[in-house]
Amino acid sequence: MGITTSKFVWMNGKFVKWQDAKVHVLTHALHYGSAIYEGVHAYKTDEGTALFRLNEHIDRFFYSANALSMSIKFAKSQLISSVKKLIKMNRIGDGYVRPLAYYGYGNVGVFPKDIPTDVALIAIPWGYYYTKDLRIRTSSFIRHSDKSSVYGAKLSGNYANSILAMHEVRKKGYDEALM
């Protein structure tokens, strides 16, 4: 599934054009998986766009940031109001919102000493994820133990084994991996 673009992205407190939302290749998160995110579904209703459990998603966003000792320089209320404004600016009905925070550009090394935490909000139009029946196969890769990371946090680095599992089952003609 390709990405449907929008007009604007919110980055570190500013609305920027989609094509200008970029990071440096030495961004810490690209090398070490030091990013956190959420996925919030948006639904077109008669009263406008409804955001599914936005408050709870932003609460978990801060929980996940704390797990990686990230300092989010924006208040919860500011992120929520920025999501709502971004939805309007991008004219999203049915869609998807991706709050993202990551250790940015600063040094090359696992420990993110003196590296800023960058925050972005992305809102794109998005309908149903699946539009047909799925073929699912159990993967030989297993889910990470809850004791191998911070339980309940959405840490991007935790998803590497899910990528491996998807490659494995797709090569065998299946749509999704069960872990």
What are these regions (language model features)?
Residues A75-K84, D94-V108:
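Short, glycine/charge-rich beta-strand/loop segments that flank catalytic centers
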Residues M1-F74, S81-K85, V110-M179:
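Helix-start/capping segments and mature chain N-termini
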Residues H41-T45, M89-R91, Y96, L100-Y102:
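Active-site microenvironments in enzyme catalytic cores
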